[in-house]
UniProtKB/Swiss-Prot annotation:
This is Lysylphosphatidylglycerol biosynthesis bifunctional protein LysX. Pfam families: LPG_synthase_C, tRNA-synt_2, tRNA-synt_2_TM, tRNA_anti-codon. Residues 1-40, 61-85, 673-693 are annotated as: Disordered. Mg(2+) 1 binds at residues 1089, 1096.
Length: 1177
């Protein structure tokens, strides 16, 4: 009777453990969420809901955290998520219990199907069955029950702990009862005492390890599953009864039905000795199989009821759509979160959520969290807490780099699955050799008469959409729709009106192929469905993709997410020349599996469009779980279809997961449509969060601004010209009505009287506010509203303060601009040079010297123009974007024009275009404009600078010696009122230096000779020049000719040491490719450089007008450019062709205007430019 008693301990075990390997049910899910994420009430409001943050992108194979293993095993760093590994000394108990029961289940199954194994294990099996644990000789059903129990124990299910503990307590009680009854043999007494000791140890361990079994079980449809179990058992009993009647063996007639019931329903736990006789041996396995089949059918029904929990409610979907509208611009897979066969868990703040499915005990998250990236860690914590609550293994499919990093920070590992193909529509084109295959396919499709129609789903009639769905089903090459993380799985839903349908139509007007794409933010689409008729011509898909990309601008689309290519890097690296054996073997293995799963086909079908590849990752907790996560992914994606499974396209969820206040706000819709978030743009939240980090003074000023706005004061009104400038007001009569406007720099408040210092561009003055003179308001109103730096407009009459200071006696005032940031120290101003460059606007507001520099620069530019206009020159504008960089030897900036798909250069000089004008008959021409050179930045160089180039027909370079001197002297006169420039004196202060009169003129070779103390002329040999350079420690390059060496000596020994303005004339011909040779001195060209105080200011040529010689020289330069010299000029055939029409003898001048301003003001280029280039912060 001992065994019979034990046989009743697990009479309903199939109900208890059927959830251990299945999807949890609705009540369990809800309670889990309540325990793991006590949601902060979050309505869709500007203050609590949403904000936007940009994403990041990188390419790496794994994202294991520092100090951790990328594959498996415990990590050395702390686990940041809620699934912290237990630190209890009893943490091993769940696994040990699961392994023990699992071994018994495995041996029981083997014994049930193999007589040999059953014979071999007979003695230990009977001992275990009699004294330790139920272990019948044959029972497939009992093996199935033990397998469920083992899985539940390993998953730390609380109900499994309870049932195992109950079994141990009952078994111990039976042993105690048998010991107390006595009349046992010595062997039985030993077995009973040993069993009792084992049970006591097991009970103590289970009780002590109670907290290690924390996982709950989601509730399923127990009644429905029980009905299926009863029906299956009844059928199994009846069929088994029939079999035992046919093959009774020695089994007595009265024991046949009880024996069958024991084997089918009772798991053969009753002692066989209770029955008279035995049936044929093979029947025991069949009886157990019937019981197992009934259990399996009931479990499947229970699983199916729990899978219904893998579904959204309407409120869930509505909240997800709201998050996507506010934050979904960076996630190409975000819209697939609205797939309705998923569950969702929200972050505590309600600003982020994760959608997931539960398959075979794996909680599989679908890509990145949805919502504010700053709330992603909260969503991941809530999701991991849910996994811990129910004992699920966490897994992620299709995470982006940013998402994978978030999961990694929560304790998961990441592996690169493959890459997503992204088309940038602004860069897409059918031209070029790389697009030849696509171009040919598109041409074939067009020749076949195909056209493309593109529509939003909302623009399609219900009848047409029904036809579209029918075509999609007919052209599907699988029995069911696939997809989980990268597919929507539905068509024709009214909530998907923003989706895009691309159709290929033949000559008869029939649709032969279609693409359906879901929204990706507001400017992108992501491929969801691709179908084509078997009769469609070759190139149909290429035509649809190309037409979509080429017409994207009219649709407001800038990016298209195409298919996902698994293991793309493996295909690419394995095919490279010199790939290693491992890479080639891995690629070969993938090619083998591509026969069934189209791995390579997906890669090549996307690669031909030349997309950007964006990696996607799978995340897992431990390497041992990778196979399990992989199987769960295969099930979720639809590649492995479980019995009775379905893909819900309607809302079948039972309990909304959205926070309570959000659900009660009235913003969410039961049909899943997006809430109205038009007034809740994330920029508001960003502004508020940024404001909380602002300095105190800024927050105070913002508060004042709000007060003014509430009081109806427009702090930024429409402009009205003041009657006077400050300078004019100071000279005006006392009785004259005056209105001035400017910035408040200082305020002195004496109660009823207030003094303020006001500055405009013309100067600075004191304004006086007296309560007795104000027409409206009081001085206190001015103090309450105005801060230093505010722009105000004041009206009144001029007068004097009691101390005799000339002041404007104010009768009325108004604010015209609220300054939200405080000005620098009123006495020192901006002292940091870098700060002055970056915030030039503040520097101008507080620093009179900066204003003087701006004014001086303006006067210099005006003077240069007026001097040239007075000589009969005309000003022109030539292209800044040029196809060939020429006109000077310098490294250019390169850009690209998409329309013509070619590189362009920002001009380094306008020379070649101005000479075209000279050919056309423009005899005196100049251009004053910007030029760009990709070179160093220092006190005298800026990548962007102002350049003057002027050309005068029938002149030479000596004419421009006087012309250049006149330009500079006139500019100095305009800036200072006299022909002087400012230079630092011995004390460091700027002192005026007279530059009037005639300036020195020297040849280059004479100047170099003076510097070396050795005679150098155009005929000096290269070897001699090299020796002189070595002696002077001037470096040179081996391929330089004599002219280049002389130029290097000149730059180091002459130019850098020049003080007074000096013209250095007659440069070597080889370093002057656009200059005519000297008329009387061989080896030199008619060119001069003007140098003053170590800086080259200008250069002038007698221009080379011989087109044959010009071509020869430019060809030499082009050879240097082809050899890798980035500064050498390229061959400009258009320019040479223009020169062949004959250009008159011309003298040309080039002058750096920025350096001219530097010379006149004595400042660096960064000080004289309003906005010089500065390093990024």
């Amino acid at each position: 009777m001992r065994r019979a008693g034990r046989s009743r301990q697990f009479s309903s075990v199939e109900e208890a453990f059927s959830t251990s390997a299945a999807r949890p049910g609705p009540r369990g899910r809800r309670s889990g969420r309540e325990n793991t994420a006590k949601f902060v009430p979050a309505t869709l409001s500007a203050s609590t809901s949403f904000s936007r943050i940009e994403g990041i992108s990188s390419r790496s194979v794994t994202l294991a955290s520092p100090g951790s293993r990328s594959g498996s095993g415990p990590r050395s760093g702390p686990r940041l998520g809620p699934r912290n590994r237990s630190t209890s000394r009893y943490r091993w108990v769940p696994a040990a219990a699961g392994w023990t029961v699992g071994v018994i289940a495995t041996v029981s199954l083997l014994g049930s199907v193999s007589p040999l194994i059953r014979y071999l294990i007979k003695v230990p099996r009977e001992f275990i069955n009699d004294y330790l644990f139920n272990f019948p000789d044959t029972s497939i059903a009992w093996s199935f029950v033990l397998a469920l129990l083992a899985a539940a124990l390993t998953a730390r299910k609380r109900i499994a702990w309870l049932l195992l503990l109950g079994n141990m307590i009952l078994a111990a009680a039976l042993n105690v009862a048998d010991i107390a009854a006595g009349d046992n043999t010595a062997a039985e007494i030993f077995g009973e005492n040993l069993g009792f000791a084992v049970h006591i140890v097991a009970i103590v361990l289970l009780v002590l390890a109670y907290r290690e079994f924390w996982a709950k079980v989601r509730k399923g449809a127990l009644v429905k599953a029980a009905a299926v179990l009863v029906a299956g058992d009844v059928v199994g009993i009846l069929v088994s009864w029939g079999l035992v009647e046919l093959f009774p063996g020695t089994l007595a007639r009265q024991d046949r039905l009880p024996y069958v019931v024991n084997r089918v329903v009772g798991f053969a736990l009753a002692d066989p000795d209770l029955f008279t006789g035995r049936p044929h041996v093979f029947l025991n396995a069949i009886f157990g199989l019937f019981g197992a089949l009934a259990l399996i059918m009931a479990t499947i029904v229970l699983f199916q009821s729990q899978r219904a929990e893998n579904a959204l409610t309407g409120e869930d979907e509505s909240a997800i759509r709201g998050l996507l509208e506010l934050y979904g611009k960076n996630d190409s897979l975000g819209y697939f979160a609205t797939r309705r066969d998923k569950s969702v868990v929200f972050a505590q703040s309600g600003r982020a959520a994760i959608t997931y499915r539960v398959e075979i005990g794996v909680c599989l998250a679908s890509g990145d969290p949805i919502g504010d990236p700053r709330a992603w860690p909260q969503a991941v914590d809530a999701w991991l807490g849910l996994c811990q609550t129910y004992g699920w293994a966490p897994g992620v499919m299709g995470a982006s780099t940013q998402g994978a990093r978030t999961y990694r920070e929560a304790g998961l590992n990441a592996l690169e699955l493959g890459d997503e193909a992204i088309l940038r529509t602004s860069e897409f084109k059918l031209s070029g050799p790389d697009m030849r295959g696509v171009r040919q396919a598109v041409t074939r499709a067009r020749r076949a008469g195909l056209t493309v129609r593109i529509r939003r789903h909302r623009d399609i009639s219900p009848e047409a959409m029904a036809d579209t769905i029918a075509r999609a089903d007919a052209w599907r090459d699988t029995q069911t729709e696939r997809g989980f993380s990268m597919a929507l799985g539905r068509l024709g839903d009214p909530a998907d009106g923003d989706c895009l349908l691309v159709e290929a139509i033949d000559r008869d007007g029939s649709v032969v192929a279609m693409l359906s794409l879901v929204p990706w933010g507001t400017t992108g689409v992501s491929l969801d469905l691709m179908r084509r008729s078997p009769s469609s011509p070759n190139g149909t898909i290429e035509l649809m993709v190309s037409e979509l990309a080429l017409n994207a601008e009219s649709l407001g689309i800038t990016r298209i997410s195409l298919n996902f290519a698994m293991f793309r890097s493996a295909f690419e690296q394995g095919a490279q020349l010199g790939a290693g054996p491992v890479a080639r073997l891995w690629r070969g293995l993938l090619l083998f599996f591509s026969r069934w799963w189209q791995l390579e086909t997906l890669y090549r079908s996307n690669m031909k469009y030349q997309p950007d590849w964006v990696p996607r990752y799978a995340c897992y907790e431990d390497a041992r779980l990778i196979p399990r996560v992989g199987v769960a992914s295969v099930i979720a994606e639809g590649f492995l279809v479980l019995p009775f499974s379905r893909r819900d396209k309607v809302h079948t969820g039972h309990h909304p997961a959205v926070p309570a206040r959000l659900a009660q706000s009235g913003l969410l819709h039961h049909d899943g449509s997006a809430p109205d978030v038009s007034g809740l743009r994330p920029e508001r939240t960003d502004a508020e969060e940024a404001r909380s980090r602002l300095p105190e003074q800024v927050r105070v000023r913002l508060a004042k601004l709000k007060v003014l706005q509430r009081n109806g004061v427009d702090a930024y009104p429409v402009g009205c010209p003041p009657s006077h400038t400050v300078a004019q007001a100071l000279d005006a009569d006392d009785q004259q009505d005056i209105t001035v406007a400017g910035r408040i720099l200082r305020i002195r408040d004496f109660g009823g009287v207030l003094f303020a210092q006001l500055r405009d561009w013309s100067g600075e003055m004191q304004v006086l506010l007296d309560n007795s003179r104000l027409e409206r308001g009081r001085t206190a109103d001015f103090t309450a509203a105005i801060d230093l730096g505010d722009l105000v407009e004041v009206s009144g009459q001029m007068g004097f303060s009691k101390k005799g200071t000339r002041s404007l006696i104010v009768t009325d005032w108004r604010m015209i601009g609220k300054c939200l940031r405080p000005l620098p120290n009123k006495w020192k101003g901006l002292t940091d040079p870098e700060a002055r460059v970056r915030t030039r606007y503040v520097d101008l507001a507080v620093n009179p010297e900066s204003r003087e520099l701006i004014a001086a620069r303006s006067e210099v530019l005006r003077s240069v123009r007026q001097t040239l206009f007075a000589k009969g020159f005309i000003e022109v504008e030539t292209p800044i974007l040029q196809q060939i960089h020429g006109g000077a030897t310098a490294r250019p900036f390169v850009t690209h024009i998409n329309t013509y798909d070619m590189d362009l250069f920002l001009r380094i000089a306008p020379e070649l275009y101005l000479k075209r004008l000279c050919v056309g008959g423009v005899e005196r021409v100049f251009e004053l404009g910007r030029a760009f050179r990709n070179e160093g930045v220092d006190f005298s160089h800026n990548p962007e600078f102002t350049l003057l180039e002027a050309y005068q027909a029938h002149a030479d370079y000596r004419v421009w010696i006087d012309g250049c001197r006149e330009l500079i002297q006139n500019a100095a006169q305009a800036a200072h009122g006299e022909q002087t420039v400012l230079r630092p004196g011995a004390d460091g202060r700027l002192q005026p230096v007279d530059i009037s009169g005639i300036w020195a003129v020297k040849t280059v070779h004479d100047a170099v000779s003076e510097a070396l103390g050795e005679q150098v002329d155009p005929g000096t040999s290269l070897s001699t020049l090299r020796k002189l350079s070595d002696a002077a420690r001037i470096p040179y390059r081996a391929h330089w000719d004599a002219g280049a060496v002389v130029l290097e000596l000149y730059e180091h020994l002459v130019e850098d040491r020049t003080e007074e303005p000096t013209f250095y004339v007659d440069f070597p011909t080889s370093v002057s490719p656009l200059t005519r040779p000297h008329r009387s001195r061989p080896g030199v060209a008619e060119r001069w450089d003007l140098v003053a105080w170590g800086v080259e200011l200008a250069t002038a040529y007698s221009e080379l007008t011989d087109p044959v010689e010009q071509r020869r020289r430019l060809q030499e330069q082009s050879l240097l450019a082809a050899g890798g010299d980035p500064e050498a000029m390229e061959l400009d055939e258009d320019f040479l062709q223009a020169m062949e029409y004959a250009m008159p003898p011309t003298g040309g001048l080039g002058m750096g205007v920025d350096r001219l301003v530097m010379l006149i003001t004595g400042r660096s280029i960064r000080e004289t430019l309003p906005f010089p280039l500065a390093k990024p912060h």
